[in-house]
A protein has these predicted regions:
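Structured, active/binding-site neighborhoods that engage oxygen-rich ligands
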Residues: 1-206
């Protein structure tokens, strides 16, 4: 399995796990057993009343960040990446998704069409410690793990500031990147096909 296949597997695995896990979110083991018995397939339902295979805000916001990163000139500055994240979050918010976390909802609703610097002001809070920032950072974390380029670790950390601006959330995004890098170190030498997942400008980097 080459690196591009591993990256695709991580992204598909994220979405599949989201679609499967949403069925029993917020349920106790006893409630799950009573309602479903054993969940070993993607069946939808749950408190969001999802269709089988439908994903939640976790996957949807992760893809917002991934799209912004792919379209950015991140290697030459941060503004296009962060502005892209903001624009993608707003477009997603306007699509009326079934669920949005409280911190994400507040930031997007209050900062629509404003510069990303104003998002930081709204998101600044030591109490916003949910996983909303972490759930979105998979794509830049993967690219950091595979390439070792610190700019991708920075992207994973900084996109979180748009909705969860505090040191705790920044730390766990950095640690997530480090964990992925450690796990992927064995395949670092087999980079075949990885350039198709990089931002347009970064693909030319060695």
């Amino acid at each position: 399995m080459n690196v591009s296949e591993r990256i695709a597997g991580a992204l598909y695995g994220f979405a599949i796990g989201d679609a499967m896990g949403a069925t029993t979110e917020f349920m106790s083991p006893k409630e799950i057993e009573r309602e479903y018995g054993k969940v070993d397939d993607i069946i939808g339902g749950g408190w969001l009343h999802l269709k089988a295979g439908e994903v939640t805000d976790d996957t949807q916001m992760m893809l917002c960040v991934a799209d912004a990163l792919i379209d950015s000139d991140l290697m030459f500055g941060s503004s296009s990446f962060l502005s892209g994240c903001c624009s993608n979050f707003v477009a997603w918010f306007n699509s009326k998704p079934k669920d949005i976390g409280n911190a994400c909802r507040e930031a997007i609703a209050r900062c629509k069409y404003k510069p990303f610097s104003e998002w930081f002001d709204v998101a600044l809070s030591k109490d916003k410690l949910g996983n909303g920032a972490l759930m979105r950072c998979l794509y830049p974390a993967i690219l950091y793990a595979i390439t070792g380029k610190v700019v991708f670790k920075w992207a994973a950390e900084t996109q979180g500031n748009l909705t969860h601006f505090n040191s705790v959330c920044r730390r766990y995004n950095r640690e997530y990147c480090d964990a992925l890098q450690s796990l992927s170190s064995r395949c670092r030498s087999r980079r075949s096909g990885v350039s198709i997942f990089l931002p347009h400008q970064a693909g030319a980097e060695t």
